[in-house]
């Protein structure tokens, strides 16, 4: 059984027991989170596709940790002008473990 749900403007395909990194959620570590924006649920031969969401569909997850991703370096450069600018960015994330998928 797997599901596709939406969180933080992105879509994630998950199954029970999977660990997923999402955009940062303001939730304490160890707590339970429910995602109700479920776009698709597949259970063996049966596939429920939402229009746009599956009615009654829910993905339940447990918050494992919070952290920051790898550093991305941004470089701005203007040729022949002796101008260059270098910046970095590390995006916050929340790691969750999928515990249940309800149709």
UniProtKB/Swiss-Prot annotation:
Family listed: Belongs to the bacterial ribosomal protein bL21 family.
The keyword Ribosomal protein appears for this protein: yes
One Gene Ontology term from the biological process aspect of the record: translation
Keyword terms, alphabetized: Ribonucleoprotein, Ribosomal protein, RNA-binding, rRNA-binding
The keyword Ribonucleoprotein is annotated on this UniProt entry: yes
PROSITE patterns, A to Z: RIBOSOMAL_L21
Lineage, opening ranks: Bacteria, Pseudomonadati, Pseudomonadota, Gammaproteobacteria, Alteromonadales
Pfam families, per database record: Ribosomal_L21p
Function comment: This protein binds to 23S rRNA in the presence of protein L20.
Protein name: Large ribosomal subunit protein bL21
Gene this chain is encoded by: rplU
Subunit structure and binding partners: Part of the 50S ribosomal subunit. Contacts protein L20.
InterPro entries found in the cross-reference section: bL21-like, bL21-like_sf, Ribosomal_bL21, Ribosomal_bL21_CS
GO molecular function: rRNA binding; structural constituent of ribosome
GO cellular component, one term: ribonucleoprotein complex
HAMAP family per record: Ribosomal_bL21
